[in-house]
Amino acid sequence: MRRRAKGAIIALVAVSAMLAIPSAQSLPGGIAGVQQAGCNCHGAVPSDTVVPSIEGLPESYNYSETYNITVSFEGGPSQEGNVNQGGFHLWASKGSLAVNDATAQLYNENEVGHTEAGNDQVSWTLTWTAPATDTNVDFILHVNSVTGNADGAGG
């Protein structure tokens, strides 16, 4: 009996650890639901040489107004001419996001990411429609700069 109890406790601790530690992953066609965990490629370690940016957001918004925004990144292993350069995931706490072309996809009104057609670039243009009421809005942007060689060395 003691051996079973010990085995059950070890299994419970292992499962709890897997659930408690957020995993980060990425796919060539994008991935939804990573606003907290972020994304990386082939288990690569996140790098502070990759600098994400969001352009086009106002300091203060007008209710229900639509803004053109550009999400992009600089740095990391991504190089012009790579088959794949990277991707992104953007989440907004309020308002609604929309895609402008086939390089990005809408997961839900608060969440958008790159598509497989859009993983050969480092910049994507989207739209964000502000909420109809006065409220604080948070944005979480994750980007993934990759080598495109699929070998796990730097993405």
Regions found by a protein language model. Give the residues of each.
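Sequence context surrounding c-type heme c attachment/ligation sites in exported
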Residues: R2-G7, S16-G155
